[in-house]
């Protein structure tokens, strides 16, 4: 067990290093000078050089790369060019909002997909099974950048039930969570249906029915419990997709999370803030996948062999 987890952990380190390194290289290859952009056209060469030196941008890119990783190892992600604040402080303020949105989206997806998937499996090939399959397929076809404006138009503008943007209350969280969790709910509904159909065909289910157990006990106590093991694993693996989707969702709803911060940092070419955001998102993805592997290995010891 310990050897398996150690191996999985060692695999994550080069992946995280590669992601941050590629982002570092790409953002430095984009034409233009962020210092010039920040100071404006009226800045003198002396002003530009002075500020480049202050942010460590006056040395070769290789040296900047080494200096950046030295800072990371000491917990220093640099200083934002645009906001003139430590990147760690900015991310610490924004990250909890993204985590809140992502967890809410996962809860929404599970609350929708588990009952829908179970219902679809129990009513296989009947009208409600076909209807749920059609709705889940429709959900897969709707990206969050299309679903978000539709929800805003209907619930916020036409019905005036929920706020359009902002954060701070449960009402502000509802539309972004549904937007972000919609596609995941569609994926999980199909997975729950498939897993339930497989479990309901097993011998132990026939034995439980032969003992006279009620259908609800057979379905929810026996079949669903086993069917959820692979489903919950997919939930963990889909966490990265939710983080990526949060970038668009936060922009649509003006949610003050790290996704919206990343877009803003990229548009202003804020080197250190972009790298800090990507590092944080990558680290979150790696940690969640590691925990998913850990809990799945507990539930299914065969994968450790």
Q: Where do the protein language model's features map onto the residues?
A:
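Hydrophobic alpha-helical transmembrane segments of multi-pass integral membrane proteins
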Residues: 17-21, 103-107, 146, 150-151, ...
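Membrane-water interface segments at the C-terminal ends of transmembrane alpha-helices
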Residues: 22-29, 68-70, 134-163, 179-183
